[in-house]
Amino acid sequence: MQDVTIIGGGPAGLFASFYAGLRGMSVRIIDVQDKLGGKMQIYPEKIIWDIGGVAPKPCNEIIKDMINQGLHFNPKVNLNERVTDIRKIAERHFEVETDSGQIYESKAVIFAVGGGIINPKPLQIKDAERYRLTNLHYVVQSFSKFKGKDILISGGGNTALDWARDLANIANSITLVYRKSDIKGYEAMISVLKALNVNLLPKTQIKELIGDNKCECIKEVKLENIETGEVTTQAFDDVIVSHGFDHENPLLKDCTSKLDLYDEYRVKGFGNTTTNIPGIFACGDIVHHDAKVHLIASAFSDAGNAANLAKTYINPDAYKEGYVSSHNDVFKESNKKVINQYI
């Protein structure tokens, strides 16, 4: 039996893993995705500015640092597993069941699933999925992949606009299509895109994807003007779709241990990561309380609280907080390696 099962491998879950290890607890992380990092994996090229004391850097670089830190104390990690139930058997005895049929036991549970299971909304046209492994994209993993190419972006939200801006000086051409006549609230961004020579096509949607002879790659796209019905055909090297995300969090509704909810997707918290069930703690975007700030930085604070409270739940005689890292002997050997990098 582990001391703590952490459900979710994003910023909150990874720092909870680190801090629980710092407090001497054994940890298991379970995540439905095939890699750690949570929602941040959707925006790997985005520059993150708002983590205190961390210089602006691409999201994927921050993910690497968070994963290295989260795995420092060697937690068990189970990826590609969806948690389907949490059962409190007794005080300091929980069962966490996954869709693999496995049941993992622990003395406490930390809920750190962010916004839940997030999947990009697929392009709703015939045979679109056949191109997903080639040149139909729902996530921009690397800007360099699109260098010198003719790109079509479909979507009118901030992500689509950001991708159009960021790729404008990398790609050969950018065409942005969106269903509305204008994009309210983004007037300044539209001006930027025009200055970057992005081809803006309002009231336009993708009607058909035309593949090559082997139907492995998109070669042309039929675009339809929603207002006039006019259809034009243009050649593109890649198509990027940004139509938002589907959020799933069936665990909150279906699990045996019923957590009080703020809405359908978030746990009602009390400001210190405790929930209505002793032994289950919630941190990061999944928890809501009146003082909540939805930032990566605040997820770290939540995670530290959750780990500390899990420690005292398991062992009421334990110190309420751990020693700070600068004075903690647990890092004695690791510090030598770090110091050598600066000599």
UniProtKB/Swiss-Prot annotation:
Q: Signal peptide: which range, if any?
A: none
* Pfam families in UniProt: Pyr_redox_2 (PF07992)
- GO MF annotations for this entry? ferredoxin-NADP+ reductase activity; flavin adenine dinucleotide binding; NADP binding
Which co-factor is required?
A: FAD
Q: Which UniProt keywords apply?
A: FAD, Flavoprotein, NADP, Oxidoreductase
Q: Please list the residues that bind FAD.
A: D31, K39, Y43, V83, I118, D285, S326
| Broad enzyme group | oxidoreductase
InterPro entries, alphabetized:
FAD/NAD-bd_sf, FAD/NAD-binding_dom, Fd--NADP_Rdtase_type_2, Ferredoxin-NADP_redctase_2
EC annotation from Swiss-Prot or TrEMBL: 1.18.1.2
Q: Which reaction does it catalyse?
A: 2 reduced [2Fe-2S]-[ferredoxin] + NADP(+) + H(+) = 2 oxidized [2Fe-2S]-[ferredoxin] + NADPH
Transcription as UniProt keyword? no
The note on the cofactor says: Binds 1 FAD per subunit.
Report the domain of life of the source organism: Bacteria
Q: How does it assemble?
A: Homodimer.
Q: Which PANTHER family match?
A: THIOREDOXIN REDUCTASE 1-RELATED-RELATED (PTHR48105)
Task: Give the protein family.
Answer: Belongs to the ferredoxin--NADP reductase type 2 family.
UniProt name for this protein: Ferredoxin--NADP reductase
